[in-house]
């Protein structure tokens, strides 16, 4: 070492000469750096100051000047001294290298002496950076000097030789010796102290780095620069071997530039692999492709540099390729021993040598995808290494090894990555297939992964096909989907991706398929098929679906079906049969995608389904067996549903999947199973209609696939599908329509058939012709025996369809369709309480019915006919949402619109239409009258009450009278209700009490307008009033009971009207004839209550007609005369007072003739019997209105004298005294009559 520094350190050029020569100030040479750059960490972009980004690699490989912009001056500043550019390396080789070693040692000393004092961080950083830059600059100068100034050695002629020439000739050998000494000085990366190696993990967010970071990256710079220099030297020497003479002479070893390059490459790879091995020991299998093998981007860049340099040398001078070096070292790792005597320099005991090898190979292949600019490319930049990989693969797949799934999954994952980067390899595919063909029944799960690692059983054919398709389109290597495959897919699924890659090679002309077709098919035969478990069968299906997608579809599908047919029908577990059907239906879906006819596949599958359905239908089949059979049957339903939903045109024999098996399956289904089956039917019906409608659109031909048939042919195929549906499904729906527990899907399915008949009327069976829509709606919407839930759901589905509403309004054969829809709505509203129960399931059904009724109400009010009726009546329906209130609005609208009609013909038509709306309405409510449901009776009586009130004019016509008579007989005057001792009709009376006012008001109007049956109606009206006046009248006067009496409420009105007056007149007649008649001297029962009722009736109405008011007056006067009970006396007096006042007010000051006539009759009737009582009664009247009694004075005086004459006893003093008291109340007329009496 001392000899190197024995020469003078005086620079060869004096400072005074600098200006003359023109000193060169070279720019900073490229170097390895991890300094932070925005966006670099996220994208993995290499440093902008590195060898690749600065173009050093490209210039090296293209034999260009390593630094064309640098070292152009006569002198160069190296290690703080100026040197002559063209001669410095020749003249001062050992001096320069000595200075270089001095700087390296100084940096090492700085690392050892550095502390964690932040105050010194800045100074240490800049000092270490300066030392490193000086070393890198020197190495860059060596490269430039070799490229520009070094001449190949030539044979020297005998004679004296200039010392410079001699030194120049020896320079290559000296360079090799010095480079070797540098490698000895810095040693191996793996041997660096731990504190230096830890710089790999420094977070590079700041701008200040410790000396250890600078030293570590200087080592990387030196290792790479040595290789660059040796490569440049070899180029300049034109392939001549350069020997290091000093080492040959001293040690006897042969050191050349070639051997030094090889040793340096091997040592560098050993160090890099050792670093990667240390990192791999912390990598979980799930992170295999997520975790890179390099510690930082500098080592990544070093890998890229080595790959391109070695591949370039391999192609240009036929040296070892990159993979040759790596394979030899990895073999050492796998064997665990060193190859030969050379120490590879990395730990030979790895926790998982094979896993590490696969991991490193995969990531090196990824690194190999980078071009000379450091950019990742789609095409491979590095030749593949399949020969080595296949050897590894055969080793891991050896049955003797019994590798676990977690190991196999890593291997397959890595192989997939390699296939994506290098292109598939048939040997890899066949090797894997040999392994998987023996292990198809395995679940390929990794226990410690939990649920995320379990293989998923595809529940539907479409799901199965999608899983297979996902294997046919593997994600790019760097994507998240690809890196997460270890978690999301098992090893078999990953193998299928490799297989698909192999089969999908472009420009291969089918060769990949021919290469492996025999190998794949030969593994399956009847015994092997019978050995398959459910997991094995799933893997079989996925395999063949991938083959069908990527190879010859028809050939693969035929082979798969033949193999599946080998499974015995009787002994195959039903779960396997379900999976088998899903697989075959997935093939059908694939056929549809390709536009191929599915007839053959569908026929075979439909036969299997029909056999299973027949067994399901038989009553001899055990319940447990039926339950198990439902698994494949439901799979078939789901799969066929997906077939129809997927098919773009339904022209590829899809109807073959719909056979007589459905006719056996549907009747045998339980409730939940039937829901699934009917849901399937809805899907098929909807898809058929959708496709058929699209087929008729002009734009259809533009959007259709190239294989789509002509519209006429398509419509024929649609007729075939429709025929299968009508034949195998519709009869069952008809058999279920009268069920008292209809499934919700029944209505939807029936509606689907109705709309199908609308779109394709010719497809309907003969028994529904010539008007199929009307026939179906009669069966499922208008029949009075149908459950309301079915009707509401069915009509809601239909009336939302604009085309069907148009047909209902004016379509051919529609007839009274709108009226029938209204009638069905009214019936459903009326019968809603027949099917409601407090039990939980029924309660849910009740809520469902309420929702459906509300929706049906909205739809019915949108019918054109209903809208017209409401508009003509001037009623708004927008705010009416409650079905009960909406029904009242509709009935009111019908009645009002009838009253506005003038022409007799219009009125006659309106009556007929109105009767169509309600139908046999009494039949709808009959169940309530039998089971005495409180809510039902309330609704029934309230509805019919509205009907009678608002349709009174209409019901009085000859066409509708019978309905009115039946209403009175059934609801108001039923025979059972007339039996006073019956206690079972409390609920009925309660309901009637609330609605009776509407009945009485409507009857009153009907009586007044009826021409043919007015007398009979009037008699019925009196009977109703009499019956319920008595029923609801309390025994003793009770203000609440009397005030809320339904008959009283019916008669009261704020504004007098002729209809109200007629009703009150009828009530007064009933009161007089039935409730105020004395039997001899005995007063009528409940007299006080009756008088209280009469008083309220008169008070709450402002009638002024004396003829009406005086109807009860004779009876009231009699009560006043004969009954001494104080309450009766008071009430009678109040009634009399009210009548007399009203009558007097009506006629003015003159006596009322009606009142006078009644009083005269009263006196005449009771003279000679109740004379004194008569005068007492008249006194009451006289107090109220003396003029009325004064007009009777002549008649009273005559009556008195007649009475005395009859008795023959002369003057009756007591009688005359009573008369005088009366006369005293009558003013002047009374006084004059008293004088006249005195004169008698």
Curated annotation (Swiss-Prot):
Keyword Thylakoid: no
Chief location category: nucleus
Region described as Disordered: 1-26
One term of GO molecular function: single-stranded DNA binding
InterPro entries in alphabetical order: ARM-type_fold (IPR016024), MMS22-like (IPR042320), MMS22L_C (IPR029424), MMS22L_N (IPR029425)
One GO cellular component term: site of DNA damage
This protein's record includes keyword Disulfide bond: no
Superkingdom assignment: Eukaryota
UniProt keywords, alphabetically: Chromatin regulator, Chromosome, DNA damage, DNA repair, DNA-binding, Nucleus
Pfam families linked: MMS22L_C, MMS22L_N
GO biological process: chromatin organization; double-strand break repair via homologous recombination; replication fork processing
Polar residues bias (residue ranges): 1-11
Assembly and oligomerization: Component of the MMS22L-TONSL complex.
Family designation: Belongs to the MMS22 family. MMS22L subfamily.
Function per UniProt: Component of the MMS22L-TONSL complex, a complex that promotes homologous recombination-mediated repair of double-strand breaks (DSBs) at stalled or collapsed replication forks. The MMS22L-TONSL complex is required to maintain genome integrity during DNA replication. It mediates the assembly of RAD51 filaments on single-stranded DNA (ssDNA): the MMS22L-TONSL complex is recruited to DSBs following histone replacement by histone chaperones and eviction of the replication protein A complex (RPA/RP-A) from DSBs.
Alphabetical list of PANTHER family matching this protein: PROTEIN MMS22-LIKE (PTHR28547:SF1)
Protein name (database record): Protein MMS22-like
